[in-house]
Amino acid sequence: MQPDPQPHGRGREKAAGAGPRLPPPVTAPSVGRPASVLPHKTANVRDHYRIGKKLGQGQFGTTYLCVGKPDGGEYACKSIPKRKLLCREDYEDVWREIQIMHHLSEHPNVVRIRGAYEDALFVHIVMELCAGGELFDRIVAKGHYTERAAALLIRTIVGVVEGCHSLGVMHRDLKPENFLFASTAEDAPLKATDFGLSVFYKPGDKFSDVVGSPYYVAPEVLQKIYGPEADVWSAGVILYILLCGVPPFWAETESGIFRQILRGKLDLESDPWPSISDSAKDLVRNMLIRDPTKRFTAHEVLCHPWIVDDAVAPDKPIDSAVLSRLKHFSAMNKLKKMALRVIAESLSEEEIGGLKELFKMIDTDNSGTITYDELKNGLKRVGSDLMEPEIQALMDAADIDNSGTIDYGEFLAATLHMNKLEREENLVSAFTFFDKDGSGFITIDELSQACEQFGLSDVHLEDMIKDVDQNNDGQIDYSEFAAMMRKGNAGGANAGGVTSTGGTGRRTMRNSLRVNLGDILKPNEN
């Protein structure tokens, strides 16, 4: 990942006469890490809450179930390791996230913050528990939905955008995964979560740091001069996916996706669009106008007939093929992650000899794991000129559990070149690992065993099979497995197995999408 040429943390160009950012940033030393994230000492989170089971693993922290000691109420606690915060700007990012959650806490469709706590190792954000699951998962589980249902969802999503903008907040990472239902009840409200990339802004402010998630990022973000209009584009992408099951602009690589976003044609003609109402298509067009000055504002979206008038959005079920595509799109391909790790650990001593010695040299305390500081110091000793964000990206590609350390196998998976991982004998070796009975096929039972070995839970095994199973026989043969491993690796896939559609880097979040405009703007190869 190449750092942006501008200084880290400088991402905004002020319009003439624009005032200072509100609220003011944390008072901190101008260099190095500040003493704390929060501007005041806090109680220990465990004095007020019992921390329970892990609910989820994000890129920036781990979320746990917690129970309030006074009231017995259930909440979510997001714990962010402070060792992941490398500099003053990272500390400010976390503090800003907390401020923004408080700032928006009265909105009925924003997850409500309960409080923030800090100790020597973590910042803990306690918030409302949303136990109803992600937006797309609910739709897929239900098995059918209508344009009218999609209109209600978009009304909620864009209502959050309008609420943010009216309070001087830009979300900057709107995507379906960041919307959760409050409970499993049929009428549970949809809530926006994860304000880790959000910023305060004033009218006229322009930003230049490239953040977000590939399918949902607006073209002006890629061009590094944007404002709150970018949130409306992202909401428009969600609407497009709700209506047809796939993103409007897609390709096999990140750079290909970005090229399509900048100049690809918006398809509103092929199936299922002929059966979608003209009013819905009109709204999609106006939310996905590349010129942000001509794009609908959030308020204009909420005033559109398709949103306002229940009679305009048809109540007939949307084609079941859309639901099927939506299911596949939203299912994460965990199989590839596991396979990359298997290959990395089975390579020959000759291929990994240098890396093995490097690992030993970096692991100064011979613990069998390396920390960020050990990695940074070790690379410096061998003359590496990697910048801190690049070292952190290397670390984080392997540190899947946010433990702050990586073991030998993880180190290999994160540092080996993709061409070694793709060699035929290595693919055969990885396939054999999953094909426990040597039948020549990976079955759903064998996948289940592998997931258990890798500590993966809540995995949709059927979807993992379907993502790869080209001939629809319910299992994965070698040719299908090899095609999956080679798919999408051109143009900067990383050997750590982090999917190209997985959003931003780690806590050092600015300029986190690997955007090379020269690469994006080159002529299409097809």
UniProtKB/Swiss-Prot annotation:
Binding site for Ca(2+) 4: D469, N471, D473, Q475, E480
Active site, per annotation: D173
Molecular functions (GO terms): ATP binding; calcium ion binding; calcium-dependent protein serine/threonine kinase activity; calcium/calmodulin-dependent protein kinase activity; calmodulin binding; protein serine kinase activity
Stated regulation of activity: Activated by calcium. Autophosphorylation may play an important role in the regulation of the kinase activity.
Region (Disordered): 1-37
Domain (EF-hand) ranges: 350-385, 386-421, 422-457, 460-491
Location of region: Autoinhibitory domain: 313-343
Top-level class of the enzyme under EC nomenclature: transferase
Function: May play a role in signal transduction pathways that involve calcium as a second messenger.
Family per similarity comment: Belongs to the protein kinase superfamily. Ser/Thr protein kinase family. CDPK subfamily.
Protein name per Swiss-Prot or TrEMBL: Calcium-dependent protein kinase 28
Provenance organism: Oryza sativa subsp. japonica
Gene name, Swiss-Prot/TrEMBL: CPK28
